[in-house]
Amino acid sequence: RLVKAIKSGKMVSGVDVLGAKAWMRLVEGNDRPVARYDSSKFDLDYLIRHFFEFADNNDVKIDSIWWNFSEGNQATYRSKRLPSIDIPVFQRWIKDDIDIVQILLDETHQRGIEAFYSHRMNGGDNEGNGGQAIIPMKESHPEWLFTGNGGSKIWNFAIKEVRQYILENLTEIVENYDYDGLELNFAR
């Protein structure tokens, strides 16, 4: 239902899409979980143990994990639309056909925990911390952008083509991965 709702282009809430009742949640958010680690110093088993250490504690009662894998303009998986993220650990995994997005989704569901994909709508090249990624679509369509704080170039969602481009990127995610929901993070 989530894929159908996104493809329809209609604004719907998670409650509308999933037909659920409102409830209190205990959420663990993982903000760019792998990017901060030196991939040469651990293996996937270590990574999984590390990321689920908190959720695996029965006293905590986590019922959902929100995974933020990237800045939204680059892919941490093998994408047909987006360039691969410029973080070495992800580049290595993509090259080796290791889909960390699917692995962590499966690990989350195996624990009976809901998994949400958190997607930054405007990240990757506007954080103001140096070393920002080059985003090919922004380079080829400067007319789709406006200037944000510190001179960063931000998608202008008032432009139909920007909305369509982002919608197609989101559609790729929800068609390839069976997450329980999709968070659109407009804070960046």
Model-identified regions with their sequence ranges:
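Glycine-rich, proline-tolerant flexible connector loops at the mouths of alpha/beta enzymes
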Residues: 68-91, 186-188
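Catalytic domains of carbohydrate-active enzymes, especially glycoside hydrolases
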Residues: 45-76, 176-181
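Conserved, mostly hydrophobic/aromatic
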Residues: 55, 65, 108, 166, ...
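Short, low-complexity, polar/charged sequence segments that are solvent-exposed and flexible
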Residues: 43-46, 84-86
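Active-site-adjacent "subsite" loops/lids of carbohydrate-active enzymes
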Residues: 5-42, 91-106, 115-176
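Outer-envelope exported proteins of Gram-negative bacteria
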Residues: 64-68, 114-120, 181-185
